[in-house]
């Protein structure tokens, strides 16, 4: 048996704004909007990055606008990490995110050997940007 991650999913209060975030900062290709006939109000779009699994952005009228629970660390996924290939690419993307008020932590070398910066999506999900 070969096991790999096919995709990860993120709830969002604003599907189009979330899709724009991934397109603008990560040059992602955004798939067509899907609207469920079985679950009225549910819609999703897939984010395709240059390599690796895709990200499914999902929304519905039941998703609260503030899904961050005031920044609390709660059970569940903590973040998604995206590799951009080099220290220079991390630095450049971190500058753009900082200018737009989305950078949480400046680029740095972590104790476990990663060069990374951390950004927050408009919904509050954390994205680690690694080299």
Q: Predicted regions span which residues?
A:
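Acetyl-CoA-dependent GNAT
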Residues: 59-64, 131
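Short, charged/polar, Gly/Pro-enriched secondary-structure boundary elements
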Residues: 52-55, 65, 123-127
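Core segments of cupin and vicinal oxygen chelate
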Residues: 2, 11-54
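Short, flexible helix/strand-to-coil boundary loops that buttress conserved ligand/catalytic motifs
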Residues: 22, 59, 94
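Alpha-helical elements of the RecA-like P-loop NTPase motor core of helicases
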Residues: 19-20, 91, 127
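Vicinal oxygen chelate
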Residues: 5-13, 44-49, 68-131
């Amino acid at each position: 048996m070969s096991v790999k991650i096919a995709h990860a999913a993120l709830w969002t209060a604003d599907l189009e704004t979330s899709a724009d975030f991934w397109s603008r900062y990560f040059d992602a290709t955004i798939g067509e909007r899907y609207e469920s006939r079985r679950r009225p109000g549910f819609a999703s779009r897939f984010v395709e990055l240059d390599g690796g699994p895709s990200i499914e952005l999902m929304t519905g009228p039941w998703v609260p606008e503030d899904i961050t629970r005031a920044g609390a660390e709660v059970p569940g996924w903590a973040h998604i990490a995206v590799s951009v290939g080099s220290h220079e690419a991390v630095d450049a993307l971190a500058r753009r995110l900082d200018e737009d008020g989305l950078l949480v932590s400046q680029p740095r070398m972590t104790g476990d050997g990663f060069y990374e910066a951390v950004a927050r999506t408009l919904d509050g999900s954390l994205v680690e940007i690694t080299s």
